[in-house]
């Protein structure tokens, strides 16, 4: 028996196995946080990368929506101006048939359309409406254009010019003098032209149904240049009115640039912008080539007399 080597001592005992298992378990626990941290970091990177395309997609959608809103605004303005031209045509037709006076007289009775609170209010309405009809003949002695300018009724002046647009020679004699009666001629003129310049170039072609309405705005601007008497100083224009006119001119130029540039503008479109800067001043971002393009495309020889009266360099 002593000749054989002991075999039991050469193999791991059962008491050594728990120590080995504990050592392996501790080693796993030390390695486990590193694995989890790596997985968390990789997840953050993946999430961050997935968010960026969605953010850019939202920006693209917002830009597309902005373009759609601007397109809708232009189309809405075109429709509104078209409706206004129809109203002007109807008023012109009624006036030629002697119906306008009756329509105006009916306006004095509009307060009676609302339900009266008591009998006293009804009697007061009737009392006021009767003498107002007697005042009409007194104001009718003054030319209509002068009366409208004195009241600074921009819509009324546009309608009056539209109704008589076929006789431009008469209007060019009447309107410049009538504008002097306005309390603030510069503000009145700016109110009259509105924001028609934001409409697309098709509204300024001869074939456009809005052509006559555009001519009204151009005639008002030209009349403003001819308003001051020669040698009697400059027209006073408040700084805030100049700022508003400059904003309009910049927006007008921007639209023309997106439609092919000033050198490709329609005649009426170029003339309108040229008259606007001649009336209220040339914005600082206008280049000399811009003015040359406007002069060339606007048929400036037809409005040379008005342009020479400008108090600004054009």
Swiss-Prot record:
UniProt keywords, alphabetically: Coiled coil, Developmental protein, Differentiation, Flowering, Nucleus
Regions of compositional bias (Low complexity) in chain numbering: 1-18
Region entry Disordered, spans: 1-31
A biological-process GO annotation: cell differentiation
Top-level taxon in the UniProt lineage: Eukaryota
Main location: nucleus
UniProt KW Nucleus keyword: yes
Record-level Gene Ontology MF annotations: protein heterodimerization activity; protein homodimerization activity
InterPro entries given in the database record: Frigida
Coiled coil (UniProt feature): 67-97
Single GO cellular component term: nucleus
Intracellular or extracellular location(s): Nucleus
Similarity section: Belongs to the Frigida family.
Protein name (database record): Inactive protein FRIGIDA
Gene: FRI
């Amino acid at each position: 028996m002593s000749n054989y080597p002991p075999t039991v001592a050469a193999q791991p005992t059962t008491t050594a196995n728990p120590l080995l298992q504990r050592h392996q378990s501790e080693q796993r626990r030390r390695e486990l946080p590193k694995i989890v941290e790596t997985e968390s970091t990789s997840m953050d990177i993946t999430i961050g990368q997935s968010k960026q395309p969605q953010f850019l997609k939202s920006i693209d959608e917002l830009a597309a929506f902005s373009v759609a809103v601007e397109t809708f605004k232009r189309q809405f303005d075109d429709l509104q101006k078209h409706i206004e031209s129809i109203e002007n045509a109807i008023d012109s037709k009624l006036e030629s048939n002697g119906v306008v006076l009756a329509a105006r007289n009916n306006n004095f009775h509009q307060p009676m359309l609302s339900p009266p609170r008591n009998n006293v209010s009804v009697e007061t309405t009737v009392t006021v409406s009767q003498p107002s009809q007697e005042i009409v003949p007194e104001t009718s002695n003054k030319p209509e254009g002068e009366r409208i300018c004195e009241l600074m009724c921009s819509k009324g002046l546009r309608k009056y010019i539209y109704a008589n647009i076929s006789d431009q020679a008469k209007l060019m004699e009447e309107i410049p003098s009538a504008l002097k009666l306005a309390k603030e001629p510069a503000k009145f003129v700016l109110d009259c032209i509105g924001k028609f310049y934001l409409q697309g170039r098709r509204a300024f072609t001869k074939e456009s149904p809005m052509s006559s309405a555009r001519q009204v705005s151009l005639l008002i601007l030209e009349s403003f240049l001819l308003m001051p008497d020669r040698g009697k100083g400059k027209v006073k224009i408040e700084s805030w009115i100049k700022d508003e006119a400059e904003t309009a001119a910049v927006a007008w130029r921007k639209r023309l640039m997106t439609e092919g540039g000033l050198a490709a503008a329609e005649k009426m479109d170029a003339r309108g912008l040229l008259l606007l800067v001649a009336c209220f001043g040339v914005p600082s971002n206008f280049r000399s080539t811009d003015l040359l393009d406007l002069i060339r495309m606007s048929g400036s020889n037809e409005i040379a007399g008005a342009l020479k009266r400008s108090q600004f360099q054009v």
